Amino acid sequence: MTPLLLLAVLCLGTALATPKFDQTFNAQWHQWKSTHRRLYGTNEEEWRRAVWEKNMRMIQLHNGEYSNGKHGFTMEMNAFGDMTNEEFRQIVNGYRHQKHKKGRLFQEPLMLQIPKTVDWREKGCVTPVKNQGQCGSCWAFSASGCLEGQMFLKTGKLISLSEQNLVDCSHDQGNQGCNGGLMDFAFQYIKENGGLDSEESYPYEAKDGSCKYRAEYAVANDTGFVDIPQQEKALMKAVATVGPISVAMDASHPSLQFYSSGIYYEPNCSSKDLDHGVLVVGYGYEGTDSNKDKYWLVKNSWGKEWGMDGYIKIAKDRNNHCGLATAASYPIVN
């Protein structure tokens, strides 16, 4: 092959390999990069643009179907826009479902009229939405949020607790920092350690580090934890009578990655394969019929820009959708 012919073949191969972008997305792409402060090298830019466009088309298709009544929730482009679903799951979903020491079993209250709606934010026992960043520490945010609520109900003081303390210091109990963990392991660490520091004294860094716990800055403690039976009815009673509850869920789907508003129902969502720790802060229903369109009100740890200001409504009483009732628990605060 002559050099000129070889050069022509190479140029043709390069041209064929270059992604063909939809030019109508140019303004949105540049705005998205500016908003989320993305800087890429040339080769990575092409790849990330291709991923972003694929996600954008999926979102547009879903929202078109929503307008036609096919779905009960909307989707929108967000900070996860240049990630494939595989990358997204690896980076932010850090719940590690495994056998572990069980806590006390939740004793459901008898002869109690359970309210049809609950929102613990209205009682002042939920801190602002936080952001775990690119660290699989969802379990730490779920655990800290649950303990924040229990401490508030005991003391009347709402103090933001240190997720970094849990990330750095609970390895002996079985947690793996940014590589995942369990809320119950976190509660066990707090019990054995004798306390948990405040977020102010031990700020979040979104990466693994050495343990820097200082007892003089501890502002919360627990004496163990309670596991809730794997039924939505039991979870409902716990949320109504105990406070915000730590739960795990299947968060592996693109529909959740780009969730925006409405009641989330994903036909492929598993009630057993759980990969993300979150916090149930209430429940309710949309419309006028309390027996329809019911949802769990869930606080996430992906920042306020995701979902409904950091929250999501997940379908309730639909066969334990996404597994919220499968691994629910809360710390014991005396």
From Swiss-Prot:
Its main location: other. Both mature cathepsin L1 and procathepsin L are found in the upper epidermis. The lower epidermis predominantly contains procathepsin L. In seminiferous tubules expression is greater at stages VI-VII than at stages IX-XII. PROSITE patterns: THIOL_PROTEASE_ASN, THIOL_PROTEASE_CYS, THIOL_PROTEASE_HIS. During export along the endocytic pathway, pro-CTSL undergoes several proteolytic cleavages to generate the CTSL single-chain and two-chain mature forms, composed of a heavy chain linked to a light chain by disulfide bonds. Autocleavage; produces the single-chain CTSL after cleavage of the propeptide. The cleavage can be intermolecular. GO terms for molecular function: aminopeptidase activity; collagen binding; cysteine-type carboxypeptidase activity; cysteine-type endopeptidase activity; cysteine-type peptidase activity; endopeptidase activity; fibronectin binding; histone binding. Zn(2+) 2 binds at residues 163, 199. Inhibited by the propeptide produced by autocleavage. Long isoform of CD74/Ii chain stabilizes the conformation of mature CTSL by binding to its active site and serving as a chaperone to help maintain a pool of mature enzyme in endocytic compartments and extracellular space of APCs. IFNG enhances the conversion into the CTSL mature and active form. Inhibited by CST6. Inhibited by the glycopeptide antibiotic teicoplanin. Inhibited by amantadine. Zn(2+) 1 binds at residue 122. Zn(2+) 5 binds at residues 250, 253. Its EC number is 3.4.22.15. Zn(2+) 4 binds at residue 205. Induction: Expression in Sertoli cells is repressed by germ cells. GO terms for biological process: adaptive immune response; antigen processing and presentation of peptide antigen; autophagic cell death; CD4-positive, alpha-beta T cell lineage commitment; cellular response to starvation; cellular response to thyroid hormone stimulus; collagen catabolic process; decidualization. Residues 1-17 form the signal peptide. It is a peripheral membrane protein. Zn(2+) 7 binds at residue 275. Disulfide bonds join 135-178, 169-211, 269-322. Belongs to the peptidase C1 family. Dimer of a heavy and a light chain linked by disulfide bonds. Interacts with Long isoform of CD74/Ii chain; the interaction stabilizes the conformation of mature CTSL. This is Procathepsin L. It comes from Rattus norvegicus (Rat).
